[in-house]
Amino acid sequence: ERLVGSEMCIRDSIPGERPDEYVIVGAHFDHLGVDETLANDRIYNGADDNASGISAVLQIARAFLATGQKPLRTVIFAFWDGEEKGLLGSKYFVQSCPFISQVKGYLNFDMIGRNNKPEQPQHVVYFYTAAHPVFGDWLKQDIARYSLRLQPDYRAWDRPTGGSDNASFALCNIPIIWYHTDGHPDYHQPSDHTDRLNWEKMIEITKAAFLNAWNLANENKY
């Protein structure tokens, strides 16, 4: 589909067999910009927050296309602006989207590239809507089936309305999954550089998340 955008988001999609059902894979692309008052490094690069998340969305879109298969539901790949200012892009989308009631699931990425626990370099927090326990089952099964090198902290959340753009969708009662590797000393600092990312873990998270997205797009029920 043609890439479309506004001041609040950029998105593209792969049409599905069911024109009235959608899933969304998203991450925010904004960060903090430049601070001229700083003495040394003034650029907030945002490697983890949230170039890491954007990279996952792009690779999942690429993987969907590589299958050559049409998904059951239309898959929208979205890049939100204004997350750092209060989830502005995703809020705008859910408030203005004419088919929001037909969105069956949302997969979010925000900060998936660091090691909050240096002694556990494969650690990742896996948030998901508690009313959909199968989301936890999916990841457990895929880690075992494909020997994915991840150690998830499974966090089922009754109403996952905090933290990131997942909140905008949860407030619309849309089930969510959110990958996150927790905070670190470079959070919202100019020192959030690419040389501090755990690239191997990002790859494993992206593999696991593609399988999540595939299930969201193709499972009849969850």
Task: Go through the PLM ranges and name each one.
Residues 1-5, 9-10:
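Single conserved hydrophobic/aromatic residue that forms the stacking wall/gate
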